[in-house]
């Protein structure tokens, strides 16, 4: 059987993994085996937290819209319900940005809506 020399390929693979975990503490950034485990754990965490970030941001947007709506005398669920009745499908991110950055515009939106249908 012929001899296969692939030393630099293995070194390249190990260096790539060590570069990935270079910000870790202690042996996790120095030793290959622990670095490999750290990389696997990091990839699991980042995959999980991508979904969590989406949920957290949606909660933040809803909280901001609710605070701005209550400042104008309407609860969040009534506000959203009325938007759906008028077939104005809300983008919560945009509504939250309007509520935070331009409260006058948000209060104008609320005042232009008629809440008679909802309050029945």
Curated annotation (Swiss-Prot):
One cellular component (GO) term of this entry: ribonucleoprotein complex
Protein's UniProt keywords contain Ribonucleoprotein: yes
Pfam families: Ribosomal_L20
UniProt keyword annotations, A-Z: Chloroplast, Plastid, Ribonucleoprotein, Ribosomal protein, RNA-binding, rRNA-binding
Annotated localization: Plastid, Chloroplast
KW Ribosomal protein (keyword) present: yes
Gene Ontology MF annotations: rRNA binding; structural constituent of ribosome
GO BP terms, alphabetized: ribosomal large subunit assembly; translation
Family per similarity comment: Belongs to the bacterial ribosomal protein bL20 family.
HAMAP family found in the cross-reference section: Ribosomal_bL20
Function description: Binds directly to 23S ribosomal RNA and is necessary for the in vitro assembly process of the 50S ribosomal subunit. It is not involved in the protein synthesizing functions of that subunit.
Entries under NCBIfam families matching the protein: rplT_bact
Record protein name field: Large ribosomal subunit protein bL20c
Naturally occurring in which organism (per UniProt): Pinus koraiensis (Korean pine)
Classification lineage: Eukaryota, Viridiplantae, Streptophyta, Embryophyta, Tracheophyta
Gene that this polypeptide is encoded by: rpl20
